[in-house]
Amino acid sequence: MPALALVDTPVDAFSGDCSGVFIPPSPNSSSASLDWSPSLSSSLYRIDGWGAPYFAANSSGNISVRPHGSNTMPHQEIDLTKVVKKATDPKSSGGLALQFPLIVRFPDVLKNRLESLQSAFEFAIQTQGYESRYQGVYPVKCNQDRFIIEDIVEFGSSFRFGLEAGSKPEILLAMSCLCKGSPEAFLVCNGFKDAEYVSLALLGRKLQLNTVIVLEQEEELDLVIALSKKVNVRPVIGLRAKLRTKHSGHFGSTSGEKGKFGLTTVQIIRVVRKLRDVGMLDCLQLLHFHIGSQIPSTALLSDGVSEAAQLYCELVRLGARMEVIDIGGGLGIDYDGSKSGESDLSVAYSLEEYAAAVVASVRFVCDQKSVKHPVICSESGRAIVSHHSVLIFEAVSAGKRHETTPSDLQFLLEGYSEEARGDYENLYDAVMRGDRESCLLYVDQLKQRCVEEFKEGSLSIEQLAGVDGLCEWVTKEIGGSDPVLTYNVNLSVFHSIPDFWGIDQLFPIVPIHRLDQRPVARGILSDLTCDSDGKINKFIGGESSLPLHELDNNGYYLGMFLGGAYEEALGGVHNLFGGPSVVRVLQKDGPHGFAVTRAMMGQSSADVLRAMQHEPELMFQTLKHRAEELSLVHKPGGDKGNDKLVASCLARSFNNMPYLSVGTSTNALTAAINNLVYYSDEAAVGNGGGCGKNGKWSYSVD
């Protein structure tokens, strides 16, 4: 039966007298939760695909974090909603009074990822009879947060896990952190180099750090030779090779013969000859390559590793004292839960399969050439840090479904042209026939004609609204549209999810609560910036909208998952929206199941202004002085009470985060002015008195 035949439309539904127009009832949201469950939400949002083994929908309809992966016991699961409540509730209620957006870090997840990677390689080495070891490094560019890097060095110390740096600040950071790590841990020095960079790397060896200078450009060798002789340090040198193996995805653009980094075979031969000529060929000990991030399959991985292993064996034959093959990055994660490897969003292998493919490829080539098995190193940043960090943000408002009412149609047909009336009659006839296709055709025709007449000035806005209301109702009744609502979120896409804007990278985005309720709308997410690109309208699974719930007075919170790598490092300050608040959460046995060990309010407006070379202190004094001058004009002698109120308001605005303060985060104003750093008994207790976070200056409102 045609869709329109199901609608009880009276004969006068489209007449000039709109008192009898049929208006469909609003959907009953109370029935949305019937026959729904967290398991259905888990399937809808693919949580079991991309989230395993760290995230799941619990029986309460909230996202649970499993901090120890598949080894997590039921009582160790952490309800993410409880963490958010602890972070954002006012201090008077036992909370930390932090403001959204909020990054929640789980060091336990980070530890599990690191140990899982190590275990995967150790298992492959043991089962395949490989006669060396795996010794990885974390590329700090993925996320340079101090506590993340310190955790990685601590967690990986027992198996010599090291760091990779690609710039002078990163090398300083890595050297400092590795002073507390294993003395055998690698400090792999990649990237473009000048004399200062090379000098820092050589200084690292003087400090008994295991630094390796990897040649990315042939001319870097002259610097290394000259400076090492000058400071009397015998360097350990690696070289990066440009392989022929290349993967076709976005992340493969840095690989292949035309890649940005690395040496060709001709350049490699020249490097070997020069090192031999100066008596330093024994310093060449590491071969590095990088196929590209998010390697989709083990077949491609094996091709690249096999090619590199052949180069490694050739360097051994040429007399280099080779010891390490560094396979670079590329260990991918499954952003969409499909495990297909058919796009940059997924990979078709597990950690264990990845490690097995690497070990098998190196072993096969080295055995063929009778070369001693090298130490295998990888730079697996994305796979290590992506899961441990969750970005939480709130939906502050949402567009409403427009329900057409008789008042919307009161000007329908008044003063319309004969052509518009003709279009209307055609639409009316199609509605009465239940002809869906003709209805859509005449709706479009009527709207276009009336828009043109409005532009010409022959229709008023009320008359145009009458046509719009009619057409919306008809389209809805025949099932011609499923309106997608816009949910406005307290977030900057450019700061917190820059890869979505820059390279169309998708991340799982899911409500962190109400998963026991059926979503009743589909929506896109619009951020706070004044930019048309500041929206999220593509989601995993090829969807252009996200199933969402109606907003209520209790807050609606969404989580972006698997964004622990790169997003924080790449974020910009478009519209001067700065960094989010951050909490660090450890699993603890007890009634709540977790402990917040560190909490930091996000960047204030003053912080962001200062980063752009403004002087917030001077700005504050200028505005305060202007207010005092105007006060004298309007009231002889001034109004000190009002002056103090204005100054206090300005001070709060400078010290507060740029994001909206709504719901539970309204206490952020107080927190932004007072004590901004929260420590548990695990960390050093500190409250710098009048000097907030990072030595924040205070404003005088006297």
Curated annotation (Swiss-Prot):
Keyword Cell division: no
Signal peptide bounds: none
InterPro entries hit by this protein: Ala_racemase/Decarboxylase_C (IPR009006), Arg_decrbxlase (IPR002985), De-COase2_CS (IPR022657), De-COase2_N (IPR022644), De-COase2_pyr-phos_BS (IPR022653), Orn/DAP/Arg_de-COase (IPR000183), PLP-binding_barrel (IPR029066)
Organism: Brassica juncea
Chain sites annotated for binding substrate: I325, D326, I327, G328, G329, G330, L331, G332, I333, D334, Y335
Enzyme class: lyase
Domain of life per record: Eukaryota
GO MF annotations, alphabetized: arginine decarboxylase activity
Sequence positions bearing N6-(pyridoxal phosphate)lysine: K141
Pathway: Amine and polyamine biosynthesis; agmatine biosynthesis; agmatine from L-arginine: step 1/1
An annotated GO BP: spermidine biosynthetic process
Catalytic reactions on record: L-arginine + H(+) = agmatine + CO2
Pfam families: Orn_Arg_deC_N
Gene3D superfamilies per UniProt: 1.20.58.930, Alanine racemase, Lyase, Ornithine Decarboxylase, Chain A, domain 1
Protein name from the UniProt record: Arginine decarboxylase
Names of required cofactors: pyridoxal 5'-phosphate; Mg(2+)
Family: Belongs to the Orn/Lys/Arg decarboxylase class-II family. SpeA subfamily.
Enzyme Commission no: 4.1.1.19
This protein's UniProt keywords: Decarboxylase, Lyase, Magnesium, Putrescine biosynthesis, Pyridoxal phosphate, Spermidine biosynthesis
